[in-house]
């Protein structure tokens, strides 16, 4: 049976979970910062504590859940999990190009540089033209 923590117990539980996790983030696999710089993640539906996470990863988790619920219209957690797995597979598949097409508004690094240089030249020309009076 789950036990509701008192606020004064949060730091001790956060540290205990940090040690249980061997100082590793269960989401990213990265090394966790010291327990005092982590947060005690919990499910906002049930209140159950899940793990000790870095603050940034905890924020990412919440934002992704919110996006999937609101924009992705996920009605239950299993649907959200299915979509996330599908998204990861999709990204992995497309690390190698699957088509020969480039989106019309995409700029290559050379095109970005040319655009920036043209903007700088235009600004210099405008400044020169405006200061000769």
What are the residue ranges of the model-derived segments?
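Compact, Lys/Arg-rich rRNA/RNP-binding cores from ribosome-related proteins
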Residues: 50, 69-81
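Short Fe-S-cluster ligation motifs
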Residues: 56-57, 79-104
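BZIP DNA-binding basic region
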Residues: 33-39, 43-44, 49, 98-130
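Conserved aromatic-histidine-acidic binding/catalytic patches
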Residues: 9, 13-16, 41, 45, ...
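Charged, low-complexity alpha-helical linker segments
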Residues: 23-26, 127-133
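Histidine-centered nuclease catalytic patch
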Residues: 24-69
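Short, charged surface segments at domain edges that flank catalytic/cofactor-binding sites
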Residues: 1-24
């Amino acid at each position: 049976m789950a036990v509701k923590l008192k606020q004064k117990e949060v730091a001790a539980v956060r540290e205990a979970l940090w040690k249980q996790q061997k100082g590793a983030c269960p989401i990213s696999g990265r090394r966790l910062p010291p327990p005092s710089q982590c947060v005690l993640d919990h499910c906002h539906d049930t209140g159950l504590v899940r793990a000790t996470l870095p603050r940034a990863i905890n924020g990412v988790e919440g934002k992704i859940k919110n996006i999937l619920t609101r924009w992705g219209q996920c009605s239950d957690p299993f649907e959200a999990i299915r979509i996330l797995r599908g998204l990861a597979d999709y990204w992995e598949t497309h690390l190698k190009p699957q088509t020969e097409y480039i989106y019309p508004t995409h700029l290559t690094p050379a095109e970005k540089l040319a655009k920036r240089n043209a903007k700088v030249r235009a600004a210099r020309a405008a400044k020169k033209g405006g200061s000769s009076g």
